[in-house]
A protein has these predicted regions:
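Nucleotide-activated donor-binding/catalytic signature segment of Leloir-type glycosyltransferases, i.e.
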Residues: 1-18
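Aromatic "clamp/platform" in nucleotide-sugar-dependent glycosyltransferases that forms part
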Residues: 19, 38
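An anion/phosphate-binding loop that grips the pyrophosphate of nucleotide cofactors and donors
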Residues: 30
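A short hydrophobic beta-strand element within the catalytic core of glycosyltransferases
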Residues: 33-34
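Short glycine/serine-rich donor-binding loops of glycosyltransferases
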Residues: 43-50
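Short hydrophobic beta-strand element within catalytic cores of glycosyltransferases
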Residues: 55-59, 64
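A charged, aromatic-enriched C-terminal amphipathic alpha-helix characteristic of glycosyltransferases
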Residues: 96-128
Length: 128
């Protein structure tokens, strides 16, 4: 990856940050999350970005299930730069969503509910 960044001549525009424990702090510095990916399963980074209240722009190769808030925009990777730029403009036109945490909770992604479910699961394992 670093070689590709160097070969493309964009080293001054790309930061390779490695494994991080402060992802939530990084997300808080962003306005929009882009995922122009060729292949993905269900990327956790998309869920994290939405939980941080970011608008998300995904490639059409990212599963639609990743957009759990239903507020993302999907753009084909073969689309021209103008199409991607228009998606970015649309995100800036939209207000930064303050409802994403509530949307996530409504869809079963509440940290509290998941912690309770995990606790119950472990309690059942101990009893058995």
């Amino acid at each position: 990856m670093e070689q590709a960044v160097h070969d493309e001549g964009v080293t001054s525009s790309v930061l390779m940050l490695g494994v991080r424990e402060d992802i939530n702090e990084l997300y808080s510095m962003l306005d929009t999350f882009f995922m122009p990916s060729l292949y993905e399963g269900l990327p956790v980074s998309c869920v994290e970005a939405q939980a941080a209240g970011l608008h998300c722009v995904y490639s059409t190769d990212v599963p639609r299930e990743s957009d759990i808030t239903g507020t993302g925009i999907f753009v084909d990777l073969t689309a021209d730069y103008g199409t991607w730029s228009n998606a970015l403009e649309e995100m800036y036109i939209r207000d930064r969503s303050t409802q994403n945490p509530e949307l996530l909770a409504l869809r079963g992604y509440s940290a509290k509910e998941n912690a309770e479910a995990l606790t119950q699961y472990y309690e059942r394992l101990v009893i058995e």
